[in-house]
Amino acid sequence: MVIMKAGSSRCAFSLGFLVGSCSLYVFLRQVWFEESFSWQSNGRSSPSPPISHEQNSSNLTWRVEGSALINLKHPNQPGEDGHIADELFKKVRILCWVMTGPSNLQSKAQHVKNTWSRHCNVVLFMSSEEDRSFPTVGLGTGEGRDQLYWKTIRAFHYALKNHGHEADWFLKADDDTFVVVDNLRWILSNYTPEQPIYFGKRFKPYTKQGYMSGGAGYVLSKEALRRFVEGFSTKVCTHTTPVEDLAMGQCLEKMGVLAGDSRDSLHRETFHPFIPEHHLTGKFSKTFWYWNYCYYPIVEGPQCCSDLAVSFHYVDPVLMYTLEYYTYHLRPFGYQHRYQPPVPAVLSLLSQTVKTTTETQRSEEGAKEKPALTNSVNPRAEEVQTTETSYKITNAAQERNTTHRSAG
């Protein structure tokens, strides 16, 4: 009997010691964060001198400023008509920061640098260590999954403090995420950066309004980012879990930031947490956790993904270049898109100018009796511009915009 009591006491002591140790660890990590984070806020440790050099000086498209890549103009292929995308590039400014690490710079981050990041206005590669040759921002954290939220907190603070004036929206993506930035711009053009809102692949557990998957990437308005940073200065938000995307969602919910609906008018998702083939071919087992996490009903097969898809996750370097080719180069001859979304309201004047110019060109071509097969888009396609689908998209975007304005 005495032996049993002694054993029970030892178990109770061990359990108490374990709980106390875990609590102390969390407390000390929080204290460490608050003290060590002062490198951002009070300038105790000044950043490295800025590096500035230009690429393609004969036809300048981007330059390096400090640890940032600045894309000076929207990239287009020779002979390509990208005037609408070019205008949105100027009016919907997106800062893209990419979560990476020293061991991933050449194996992963370099391929992001070569592909989709060229469509962002500002690009930052966030790492635990500074690398001025790549370049990366050194966040002064460790590496590993338990460091993801630390890196995210510091990265967003850094982005707002150092580049807040250069962007309206702030996208977080991993170094194995592929993003179609131009499609993201179209979604964001229906909102304003003054609205406290963010978008991504919406999950539902553990928060009232849901939260956005970290792997698929998520984008914050400038006001949402301001509130996120404020949440830490007021201690409304703290680092209590290493689960980055969930902790992010919980903080933003506390700060009154709305979790936006980024689906298209046909309720197809735009942000995707897996590679395209997993969504398109229905490879998800019914016991897979994904079924219990998705905020909206899962659709498998060809209708899984919007024609204006924004992102895919777990993309290896080969697939990164493949998706870049499929997105910006591959075209089937003789076909129009299933629907052509309406030009955003912010570009309505440009749209009218383009329409007038197109009609003038069409008249001139008719007068010259050019052959039917030309290198331009089929003129008749523009005469059938407003389809039932595009009408629904316009209404859906306007309704969401009105709703979010009221909520903001």
From Swiss-Prot:
Residues 33-408 are lumenal. It is a single-pass type II membrane protein. Pathway: Protein modification; protein glycosylation. Residues 356-408 are annotated as: Disordered. Glycosyltransferase that generates the core 1 O-glycan Gal-beta1-3GalNAc-alpha1-Ser/Thr (T antigen), which is a precursor for many extended O-glycans in glycoproteins. Its EC number is 2.4.1.122. One of its GO terms (cellular component) is membrane. It is an enzyme of class 2 (transferase). The chain crosses the membrane at residues 13-32. It comes from Danio rerio (Zebrafish). Residues 1-12 are cytoplasmic. Keywords: Disulfide bond, Glycoprotein, Glycosyltransferase, Manganese, Membrane, Metal-binding, Nucleotide-binding, Signal-anchor, Transferase, Transmembrane, Transmembrane helix. Its cofactor is Mn(2+). Glycans are attached at residues 56, 59, 401. Belongs to the glycosyltransferase 31 family. Beta3-Gal-T subfamily. The gene is c1galt1la. This is Glycoprotein-N-acetylgalactosamine 3-beta-galactosyltransferase 1-A. The keyword Disulfide bond applies. Disulfide bonds join 96-120, 237-251, 304-305. The lineage of its organism: Eukaryota, Metazoa, Chordata, Craniata, Vertebrata. One of its GO terms (biological process) is kidney development.
